[in-house]
Amino acid sequence: MPFKRFVEIGRVALINYGKDYGRLVVIVDVIDQTRALVDAPDMERSPINFKRLSLTDLKIDIKRVPKKKDLIKALEAADVKNKWAKSSWGRKLIVKKTRAALNDFDRFKIMLAKIKRAAGVRQELAKLKKTAA
């Protein structure tokens, strides 16, 4: 299977290290072989090392170094936020963030729900075994 996530202008990437960790950005220019100029609607345009970026499958159609308003229009037209939220990678990050925000009582309630669900599964399995025998 060929590699499909190339560093290119318009590629949506996820910052995986630093103060902007977890933020979706768009590559607007390639500075050199180790750095790119990235931009997002809610941040300043800044250079970032490729090692701090995780490339996604999402790509928007923009020119090199667009104005902020053009970038925002392109992001909205491509519906990047919704596509990211629907992707398995995006959903995993959302689940991870919500689990990290749980307090002790929430974790306790989840534990009780899991126990209750497992008991229900066990009862149904016992019924099926009884009817099969």
Swiss-Prot record:
Transmembrane segments: none annotated. One of its GO terms (biological process) is ribosomal large subunit biogenesis. InterPro entries: Rib_uL2_dom2, Ribosomal_eL14, Ribosomal_eL14_dom, Translation_prot_SH3-like_sf. Pfam families: Ribosomal_L14e. Gene3D superfamilies: 2.30.30.30, 6.10.250.2270. Keywords: Ribonucleoprotein, Ribosomal protein. It comes from the Eukaryota. This is Large ribosomal subunit protein eL14.
